[in-house]
Amino acid sequence: MDSLLFGTAGKPISTKGDTVEGIKHVRRLGLDCMELEFVHSINITKEKAILVNKAAKEKKIILTCHAPFYININSIDKKKFHASLNYIINSAKITSLCNGWSVCFHAGFYQKDTKEKTYETVKEGMKKIIDEVKNFDKKIWIRPEISGKISQFGSLNEIIRLSQELEQVMPCVDFAHMLARTNGKYNTKPEFISILDEIEKGLGKEALNNMHIHISGIEYGEIGERNHLILEHSKLDYKELLNVLKEYKVKGVVICESPNIEEDAMLMQNLYKKF
């Protein structure tokens, strides 16, 4: 990536039509990326992916995807475990056919296991995922996401560690989830800087040139995330966050997950350009 691009989680709300029309509308809005939302189902066929690929290339839109919500790589139920792996693999297959760049997902829950045992289970599952993905795409990034609840696997350190130990894996950094997961921490300039410093320390400067970021407003409590909000209604200091991203010359994509996806995406893009 040569710069930091802004876009929407899914096709813009104001889109009239399908994913292809969503890509065209993202370009009309002056945004540069879009996340394919497979959160409830992988809803793009192989045939449709060819059309999505063509539209994204023509409009110069970078595509990412969010794999289904039903993933729990730490499930003791073997059927759910293997289904979770397949959700990620199949999301990557379709995203690859769409000429997508990155696949993010929530890896699972600690349940009754220790954090270390959960880590090892998730790591073993992800090894299987990467082995499969390499058969059809050796460049697409597989990205476990920082999660928003303390019951979920996915702290910053866990995600960095997976990225250190597995090929083709990098973090998806959700700053709203960091805020919610820590019940209000990581919301000042020094704290935002500490996140980027931790990533660079663990994964090198290249990691800051290759970031898949989620930003939204968020409501949270003691156990973490409750729901997403528009930025202006949230405690997240998104202005300071964008300032830090600009100062550090971070490159990659910022996907807006606020309820008003295109409005907040354009708000962030315009603010970022002013710094």
Name the predicted role of every residue range.
Residues 262-275:
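C-terminal helical cap(s) of enzyme catalytic domains, especially alpha/beta-barrels
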